């Protein structure tokens, strides 16, 4: 897995809440467990017209987002069924970072991302950042008035910098285990191999009757 330390890219905005995994990658593309070829199918039902042409009414098809790699969207992104294909599609469509807001309802704070989706992004080297709705609104406003707006994400110091006419920097918080995993480019297999010696020692001292060897 490619390590993630810093990333600079064009921001694209998707002004929709509760984007579920079926919207990210529809069910007809789930027949394969290969991890390749999903990029063009990301947001398929929104992205294309009935005859398969790019839909000019879908916001991510707008020319001002050409070359985008940072997606800024609304609350509860990645909800719905637990399909890792959704993350594969986003990564293969060029996204390295997704930014969304938590939502305050009374005394409750609703997370920006669905739990399983968030876990799958970490496994695939994608960074998800939670910010307040106020900050997300400001980024939407800047992006609307500044085509090709870029941002830099620095995971080492946990800062997002918007390179607008008036630059702005926002701190963010990432769970330390997730941060370490992304910075070092460790997938689940690599994480296990870090403890290879301990695993081998455990296997060596484990009683043989436990696995039916006696």
Curated annotation (Swiss-Prot):
Keyword field contains Plastid: no
Key word Amino-acid biosynthesis present: yes
Entry keywords, A to Z: Amino-acid biosynthesis, Branched-chain amino acid biosynthesis, Leucine biosynthesis, Lyase
A Gene Ontology molecular function term of the record: 3-isopropylmalate dehydratase activity
Coiled-coil spans in chain: none
E.C. code: 4.2.1.33
InterPro entries: 3-IsopropMal_deHydase_ssu, Aconitase/3IPM_dehydase_swvl, AconitaseA/IPMdHydase_ssu_swvl, IPMI_Swivel, LeuD
NCBIfam families assigned to the protein according to its UniProt record, in alphabetical order: leuD, PRK01641.1
Summary of subunit composition and partner proteins: Heterodimer of LeuC and LeuD.
Protein family membership: Belongs to the LeuD family. LeuD type 1 subfamily.
Protein name as annotated: 3-isopropylmalate dehydratase small subunit
């Amino acid at each position: 897995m490619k390590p993630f330390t810093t990333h600079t890219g064009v921001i694209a905005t998707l002004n929709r809440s509760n984007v579920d995994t079926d919207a990210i990658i529809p069910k007809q593309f789930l027949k394969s467990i290969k991890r390749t070829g999903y990029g063009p199918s990301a947001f398929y039902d929104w992205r294309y017209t009935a005859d398969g042409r790019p839909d000019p009414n879908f916001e991510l098809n707008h020319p001002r987002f050409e070359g985008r790699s940072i997606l800024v969207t609304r609350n509860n992104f990645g909800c719905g069924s637990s399909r890792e294909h959704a993350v594969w599609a986003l990564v293969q469509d060029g996204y390295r970072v997704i930014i969304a807001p938590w939502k305050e309802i009374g005394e409750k704070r609703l997370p920006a991302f669905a739990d399983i989706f968030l876990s799958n992004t970490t496994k695939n080297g994608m960074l998800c950042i939670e910010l307040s709705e106020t900050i997300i609104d400001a980024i939407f406003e800047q992006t609307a008035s500044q085509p090709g707006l870029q941002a830099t994400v620095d995971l080492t110091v946990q800062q997002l910098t918007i390179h607008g006419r008036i630059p702005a920097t926002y701190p963010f918080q990432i769970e330390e285990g997730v941060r370490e995993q992304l910075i070092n480019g460790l997938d689940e297999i690599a994480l296990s191999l870090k403890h290879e010696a301990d695993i081998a020692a455990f296997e060596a001292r484990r009683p043989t009757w436990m696995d039916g060897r006696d």
